[in-house]
Amino acid sequence: MEREYMEFDVVIVGAGPAGLSAACRLKQKAAEAGQEISVCVVEKGSEVGAHILSGAVFEPRALNELFPDWKELGAPLNTPVTGDDIYVLKSAESATKVPNFFVPKTMHNEGNYIISLGNLCRWLAQQAEGLGVEIYPGFAAQEALIDENGVVRGIVTGDLGVDREGNPKEGYYTPGMELRAKYTLFAEGCRGHIGKQLIKKYNLDSEADAQHYGIGIKEIWDIDPSKHKPGLVVHTAGWPLNDENTGGSFLYHLENNQVFVGLIIDLSYSNPHLSPFDEFQRYKHHPVVKQYLEGGKRVAYGARAICKGGLNSLPKMVFPGGALIGCDLGTLNFAKIKGSHTAMKSGMLAADAIAEALAAGRVGGDELSNYVDAFKASWLYDELFRSRNFGAAIHKFGAIGGGAFNFIDQNIFGGKIPVTLHDDKPDYACLKKASEAPKIDYPKPDGKLSFDKLSSVFLSNTNHEEDQPIHLKLADASIPIEKNLPLYDEPAQRYCPAGVYEVVANDDGSKRFQINAQNCVHCKTCDIKDPAQNITWVAPEGTGGPNYPNM
């Protein structure tokens, strides 16, 4: 069909730290060179920041480069880290505090800040618009615009006003637009659905290890002022997880008597009975955590997958007409459990490459090889190289053995131990059969520290237009009941942190698989963990999904 179109020099998909940093850098470079570069950013959330969720302890290295005067400009970095506490939780009641000497250097946070990444992205968007960037929130990029020569020429935004059966709704239908560009940057975050398509189409991961993921579940709490320690960073390993189902937790004291509390579970976990949501709820009852939360009030909830494969799992970064940046590429430094500064730097490097190409009179559609060269010469590459073994060591040797390896690698060899560990088994292939794994009996939530999924999703402010095509696509509708249920007790009912997937009984006693798509918080776990790789997440109508205030 013929669609309306707009033309830009650069289109960026996603208003997260990578996309917004790229946009700002492009405009800065254009101003320095006295040239015009038109830049458009599309964002599927209802506003910038609505879909942003991160810990976040923020390292300002890339921000210092992008806006050296960020303090004067009012960037929302208000809580410097004042201390790091690391515990190994041995059971539901006991814990050992790790002496500072034994903590990997990458886990020290002097000079970093506890922030809301959503609020930082809102601030970056203000800077970008001040520089002349056009930002369009509420518009979901649905697919890449690829010409007959296999060159990416921009994106197509999703149609609006389509009913559940795919038919236009009278009086409401608006076809999506083509946003054409000389170069297109994809900054959709972890497991971006267009990024996934591009990796497959251009075979970008042919020389990379399998990507690895975690699911991060996070809440914001208002706590008793007498328990509040602004700037304190608490990390834990161990209980409620184990060596076959690994992960770790965080609890960060920010300003205004608030804490961020969360649990990250590696999606390589093996027990199909495991529920990341319920593990997080019971984790909050541990004395190390409860001491801060007791008497407080939960005010926000959300979840998001993270890419943690690191350097060994990076796909090729470029293709004709564009590039992957940030978590769409997989630049998170898992040794630091930080991805914001690395995402920003990748966006800035790509922006430099595009500005250079346009200044040289290139008309677009080519491969940005100068982005790849600049990446390999940057501190970003050095960081990812030094942390390349961190996740693989934990997968191979467990939390204790992997922790010992990482201590030696990071503290003695500075991340340059002369061996590279590879972990090429994809996360979805790690599940045991339900009959081979112990069942897990989760305690009922008490409504004070622990809660159920529905009341949690309510706090994410998630909303979707109900009469639209379901954005969680099953390649084969029979697999959930006929294969996943008998083999794995259909793990989707547990790995989803928002109650999207249910196995329900029909009147005749048979079972059916129900998808409550309106609950989806866009975490992407189902797209990653389904053992049959039968679920594909695509973007729903723009503005749909969570509306995180300051996650």
What are these regions (language model features)?
Residues E36, K44-E93:
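N-terminal FAD cofactor-binding segment of flavoenzymes
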Residues G330-K336, M348, D352-F397, Q514-N516, ...:
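Active-site-proximal substrate-binding core of FAD-dependent oxidoreductases
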Residues A303-F334, S456-D467, P480-Y495, E502:
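FAD-binding beta-loop-beta segment adjacent to the flavin cofactor pocket
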Residues I394-K448:
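C-terminal auxiliary extensions adjacent to catalytic cores
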Residues A18, E47, R191:
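Conserved Rossmann-like nucleotide-cofactor binding loop
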